[in-house]
A protein has these predicted regions:
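Active-site lining segments that contact anionic ligands and/or coordinate catalytic metals
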Residues: 124, 131, 152-156
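Conserved metal-binding segment of the jelly-roll/cupin
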Residues: 129-143
Length: 211
C-alpha cells in the first residue's frame, strides 16, 4: 500500500506500474534473479536490463474488463526466434484455479497472430503454484489473468527484461543516483540501464573507460 498520489486516478484497480519509482526497496528482488539460468540462457549471456517492474492484485471484485483479463502479450513487436523480452512473474500468494491464476497458451510465442478466444480457451493451461514461486516465460506468449471467485487477494510482482539496447518503459537508471551505498554497485548500474544510457554530451562520450 502507498500513500495517495494524484496519478492514482489514472491507474486501473489492481494494477500497479513501476513500483521502484514509489519505493526503491522493490529492487532488492532483482538480486535474487541475477544468477537465474533461465534469464542468462534466454539472453545468451549478454547484458540485459529491467524493462518494467509492476504488480497485480486479483480477487473477485477486480474488473472483469481489465486488460489483464484479456488475451494479450506484453510486447507489441514480434521478431521470430529472437529473444526480445522475458516476463518474470513472482507469486506473492498461492496461485489457484479459484483465485484466478495466470493462464498461458503453450507454443504461442512461435506465432505472430493473436489466437482466437476459442483456441485459447481450449488449449490454455492455468499455472497453479505456491507463494514464492517464480514463473519465467517468453514475452511473445499469449496469456491472461484468470477469473477469481473469492475475495481474498492474489498478489504478484510482474517484471520484464530486455536486451540492454531496448528502451525501458521507465527511466530506472535515475533511481540509481539515490540508492543506498550497498546498492550502488555494478549489478544495479547494469540492470537499471545506467551503464547503457545514451550520452548527453561529448564529456560523457569521451569519459575514462574505467569509469
Amino acid at each position: 500500500e502507498v500513500a495517495y498520489q494524484p496519478w492514482q486516478v489514472y491507474r486501473q484497480p489492481g494494477v500497479f506500474h513501476h513500483l521502484p519509482l514509489v519505493d526503491y526497496r522493490f529492487l532488492r528482488v532483482l538480486e535474487r534473479l541475477a544468477d537465474s539460468k533461465v534469464l542468462n540462457d534466454y539472453f545468451d549471456h549478454n547484458n540485459f536490463i529491467l524493462n518494467s517492474f509492476g504488480g497485480a492484485v486479483n480477487n473477485k471484485t477486480m474488473d472483469k474488463n481489465s486488460y489483464l483479463k484479456e488475451i494479450h502479450r506484453d510486447v507489441n513487436y514480434y521478431i521470430k526466434n529472437y529473444p526480445l523480452m522475458m516476463n518474470v512473474l513472482i507469486m506473492l500468494d498461492p496461485f489457484s484455479k479459484v483465485n484466478g491464476a495466470i493462464e498461458i497458451l503453450p507454443g504461442s510465442h512461435k506465432v505472430r497472430e493473436k489466437p482466437s478466444a476459442d483456441e485459447f480457451n481450449t488449449n490454455n493451461i492455468q499455472i497453479v503454484s505456491n507463494a514464492g514461486d517464480v514463473l519465467f516465460f517468453n514475452s511473445y506468449v499469449w496469456h491472461r489473468a484468470g477469473i477469481s471467485h473469492i475475495l481474498d487477494k492474489r498478489r504478484a510482482l510482474t517484471l520484464t527484461y530486455t536486451p540492454s539496447y531496448f528502451k525501458p518503459q521507465a527511466d530506472y537508471s535515475e533511481i540509481y543516483i539515490n540508492l543506498p551505498d550497498d546498492m550502488k554497485n555494478n549489478f544495479y548500474k547494469a540492470v537499471l540501464g545506467k551503464s547503457s544510457k545514451i550520452v548527453k554530451n561529448l564529456d560523457e562520450w569521451y569519459i575514462d573507460y574505467e569509469k
